[in-house]
């Protein structure tokens, strides 16, 4: 299928010129170009038009998860018939393994995986291996290890109605694909077999595939996971591995041999150096890890052995999302039924994709959004990771091969990406120097001019105050917020620290202002919901530190307040100020207030550049008779677009309600008295704690409390009715 752009708007302002310029550059084979577009000029719409014109699979890289989610949602609006997917880190919490020699402190890796985001990541790789019309919007996670696309592709499973099926071979294949067999409730990446019926829940969808089999597949049904209602019957189904790291038995045995060989060499080196502690530490660690992998297929930190499992040489970069782009041919879903690309495994009734059949050149487009931030971020990932790994290797916590479980170096990243377009309102010297063409997009189709910039001393008599009281920046801010709220508009406030953002938010709430904060400690999905709530009017003020600078598109915002603007530094540099000022450029009433007692060089340059852009836009408006108007943008629930449950961290009350609901289901058909059920659950809780299953023990503890509350309620004497 081809990319098909859908929009009620046509390119206007500087957009037509920018589109033609970028398309010309791509057709001429230019490796790097820069789109220098001011905030609110429709850079995303321009790039959507470019994608439709060149018809290339596209990788869009953003510098944070929130911006990536917003971009993904916008591209989904533009390309509703094509595959637009979201690829970011699936960790809600991540503490990397580390060792601090100074204090002799070892920190074990801790991580909390978000299953919803993991599902979206699988949707990305599966789209890349099944079609050509794919746009992936990713964070810097795109340069981290993901597993070999060749190994992943080898065991893709294609099941067709009417084909002969060896049930044992299919069971073995599903297990090899990292699917878990279960006899109870299905979850993503699991399957069960009941009589003649296979039920399989893929990792990238919230549905169940039900297969009825005898000597052949007689029926394939798509079933709703909750209601178990059959949505439709299908002629065939494609199943992809449940995990990105897929290793065959033969590859595992080879990896074990290589790990043991490397261990022997490293132990010999420690012995020569007289490092007895490091010798014993490494020997025990690797022996334990290998035993765990052998018995359960996994160990904590297994990714540190990825070089051996993937068969890579010393220093070779890991496989990443970029390799899936380079490997993609987009033929599975659309062409496979008529194509000779499939080979059937003899006597097993399983159609698998023949190795190498999907290989193609890396003919894809790369768009680096907010490149002035994203490029340095990509460049810095490798060095930080390497320093930490060197310490672990030196002190016997890891083998030297752990260094190759790493992000790509910047030069490796550049080797793997396709033709690149840097997109920024403030590109750095690097982008301008590297680009073969600079395309400007300064004029906004809406006629909107850059916002008015007001510099206000941190203490000053406010024009609306009748008394001589000197106002602080926060008191002045509250007056301005109240004015905007009366007009139904929103406000962004940037502070210097997370603590300041949290404290200011609490203070605003005390003043009956609907405010919330956002910073790096807020979980990915919650950040997205906070921004959606601001646009919907559930909150009026959003306070942040660094996440409010680049790219966030909120036309409802008419006031941006920058506190302590004269504190020169990273967060108050010329580029940072221009980007933050741009957050008010999508509203006709846009205004920016810089709270400062001194005029810094960064402030002066940012204000001067903003004024220059205002003059360019005003001249264009006058020449074309354009009246500025606020950008109109549909408010869509991004989480629902991704098929993710829209919820913040559950309140105690909602958790209690959920617990009660689970208990009701758990007790269906259990006619025992409540005290007996409580006693049984207490025993289960102790067993869980004894087995170190603390999460299960905590759930049982909460259930016991709920049941005891019911018992207490039932024992209360009923009040007598008054006559």
Question: Which role fits each region the language model picked out?
Answer:
Residues 336-350, 354-360, 653, 657:
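A cross-taxon signal for low-complexity, glycine/charged-rich
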Residues 522-544:
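Conserved helicase ATPase core of P-loop NTP-dependent helicases/translocases
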Residues 34, 87-136, 140-328, 362-486, ...:
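N-terminal cationic and glycine-rich segments that engage phosphates or anionic surfaces
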Residues 28-50:
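Walker A/P-loop
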Residues 150-154, 495-519, 706, 710:
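Conserved helicase motor "Helicase C" RecA-like lobe of SF1/SF2 P-loop NTPases
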Residues 80-89, 301, 454, 489-492, ...:
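Conserved RecA-like helicase motor-core motifs
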